[in-house]
A protein has these predicted regions:
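Juxtamembrane helix-loop junctions of ABC transporter transmembrane domains
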Residues: 21-22, 29-38, 42, 50, ...
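Transmembrane helices of ABC transporter permease
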Residues: 11, 15-28, 39, 59-63, ...
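An intracellular "coupling" helix at the cytosolic face of ABC transporter transmembrane type-1 domains
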Residues: 11-13, 99-103, 119-132, 136, ...
């Protein structure tokens, strides 16, 4: 375990310390028991002293009961510490991801993050729980048992002094060989989980194109590769068992030979030899524990590296010390803005963008696929930082604002509409968790969603399931618009968010915006000219450059790109009629 991950122990430090403490007490009792057995055999049984046998036998039972009690307490403490540590680790990863910018998130796949928070954390939890118990138990058991063996017979003790380092070195060698293979296994788990996620999310597309067999074959290929990698790792780890067994049998054979000779020549009593055999088993069992924990640690090390990648990731965007917490108005300025997703030196998605949007204006943005319309608006709430230049909101550079304060005043309905499991009411209240039912209904009326919501038997308490699969695309878009409106933002951005809505409903939404939220700056990205035709200004984008700004009439007269789009849609529609 590295220091980054150990910080997550926090309030479970007490249990993490108590577990090995009780393990030490348990081991002390277990180590003293064979010594008592030797006395019972050599003094009690061999001399026929019944009272001595009873007296020492009672002490033996008490020791055994104490060992059992300490073992139970140690197990309980280790379980609490392990489960608590895993809980904190999950929280830490989840909280860290919440701090990430889009650029940070782009470095990790969704399935990779899910695997880290489930499989990887479970591996680390098991290794931690085993470590604080067995890694405390095994070394102490080996040392104390060896000391007791040394007191009974120096020759046999010397035998173990040779065997233990040899075995330990072999186990470490096996662990180092297996570790890289386990890393590959868990990286491949990400791909496997991603395949499952894609298939489930796109199940309707898969069935529509009758691609079930193709998906099964693809999944089988990935699954088989995971199996191959895991088998390679396990084949290396499998050497632990034969190495351990060979060591145990060799040690026992040598020990019996040495011990038998010592008894024959009167250097040892039978009871002492019995104790030495018990101590030998204790040492061997401790070594087997180390082997078992080593396997767990090997797996956990690969998981630890992957978890640390997330926790060590530095958020691209952080608030300044005296960040501004209030946005004055919805005025927006782009001043010589360049942007690249790859950062400095990468291919530019936006090139020398200069733009001024007055507070309260309705702005339309139009352009072909790949013209960076979405990229442009994502810079306003600072979902990404500019590569060069400045984006200003309310007269200030967006980097001067507290991120939460800025994004609270910039509502954005993204291209991919996302609804969460819960009622319609709960989904809308994502925009403002303290909103009343009246406020929720008001924004739903503005978004033209109130009508279809009331047609559901449960109305606003209708459950949304599986990211909104029980509502249509147009209904989903209107619910997302209502959610954005509930924030009462100074800037509202609709990124092609009415594409699944019919033209009549689209017109009603725009009319409601004009009448009900005139002071809010409204930016509408659309493929339909009719959705932005009446905007105060229309921005024409092409390959990351602004090719024209003006009203629809002005652009028809001066901008060839806009004129072609307009004529293809408006005149094309007339021809269809």
């Amino acid at each position: 375990m590295n220091k980054t991950l150990l910080k997550s122990v926090r309030e479970y430090k007490k249990q993490s310390v108590l577990a090995p403490f009780f393990v030490i007490l348990e081991v002390l009792m277990e180590v003293l028991i064979p010594m008592e057995m030797a006395k019972i055999i050599d003094v009690g049984i061999m001399q026929g002293n019944l009272s001595y046998i009873v007296r020492r036998g009672l002490i033996l039972v008490i020791m055994a009961m104490l060992a059992l009690y300490f073992g139970i307490i140690a197990g309980k403490m280790a379980a609490i510490a392990g489960a608590g540590y895993a809980k904190n680790l999950r929280h830490d990863i989840f909280y860290k991801v919440q701090e990430f910018s889009f650029k940070n998130i782009d470095r990790f796949s969704t399935s990779g993050l899910v695997t880290r928070m489930t499989t990887d954390i479970t591996n680390v939890q098991m290794a931690y729980m085993m470590s604080i118990r067995l890694l405390a138990r095994a070394p102490i058991m080996i040392v104390l048992s060896w000391i007791m063996t040394l007191l009974l017979n120096k020759k046999i003790a010397l035998l173990f002094l040779i065997i233990i380092p040899l075995l330990g070195g072999t186990l470490i060698f096996i662990a180092k060989k297996a570790h890289p293979h386990f890393i590959k296994v868990f990286d491949e788990y990400d791909i496997l989980n991603n395949s499952v996620q894609e298939n489930v999310n796109a199940s309707r597309v898969v069935k529509a194109f009758v691609r079930e067999d193709h998906e099964i074959e693809k999944f089988h290929g990935i699954s088989k590769y995971v199996y191959t990698l895991f088998t390679k790792a396990e084949k290396i780890v499998a050497w632990n068992s034969p190495v351990m067994q060979f060591t145990i049998y060799t040690a026992m054979l040598l020990m019996v030979a040495i011990g038998g000779r010592e008894i024959v020549f009167g250097a040892m009593e039978i009871g002492e030899m019995t104790s030495v055999i018990v101590y030998a088993f204790q040492i061997m069992m401790a070594l087997m524990m180390v082997t078992f924990v080593f396997v767990m640690i090997m797996i956990a090390e690969a998981s630890t590296d992957r978890i640390t990648e997330v926790l060590a990731e530095v958020p691209e965007m952080q608030d300044k010390k005296n960040a501004i917490t209030e946005v004055a108005d919805g005025e927006i300025r782009f001043e010589h803005v360049d942007f690249s997703y790859a950062g400095e030196g990468g291919n530019l998605s936006l090139k020398d963008v200069n733009l001024h949007i007055k507070s309260g204006q309705t702005i339309g943005i139009i352009g072909g696929t790949g013209s960076s319309k979405s990229t442009l608006v994502q810079l306003i709430p600072r979902l990404y930082d500019v590569t060069k230049g400045t984006v200003k909101v309310g007269g200030l550079d967006v980097r001067e604002y507290n991120l939460e304060a800025l994004r609270d005043q910039v509502s954005m309905v993204l291209q991919k509409n996302v609804l969460f499991t819960g009622t319609i009411y709960d989904n809308i209240r994502w925009g403002n968790e303290h909103a009343s039912e009246e406020e929720v209904q008001r924004v739903c009326k503005l978004a033209q969603a109130d009508g279809f919501i009331k047609e559901f038997p449960a109305g606003y308490h209708t459950m949304i399931v599986q990211v909104g699969n029980n509502v249509s695309g147009g209904q989903k878009q209107r619910l997302c618009i209502a959610r954005a409106l509930l924030k009462k933002p100074k800037i509202l951005i609709l990124d092609d968010s009415t594409s699944a809505v019919d033209t009549k409903t689209d017109a009603l939404i725009r009319k409601a915006f004009r009448e009900e939220i005139p002071d809010t700056t409204k930016i509408i990205i659309a493929q339909r000219v009719s959705s932005i035709e009446n905007a105060d200004q229309i921005i024409v984008l092409d390959e990351g450059k602004i090719m024209g700004v003006g009203t629809s009439e002005e652009l028809l007269a001066t901008n060839e790109i806009y004129r072609e789009v307009y004529e293809s849609q408006i005149k094309g529609g007339e021809d269809d009629e």
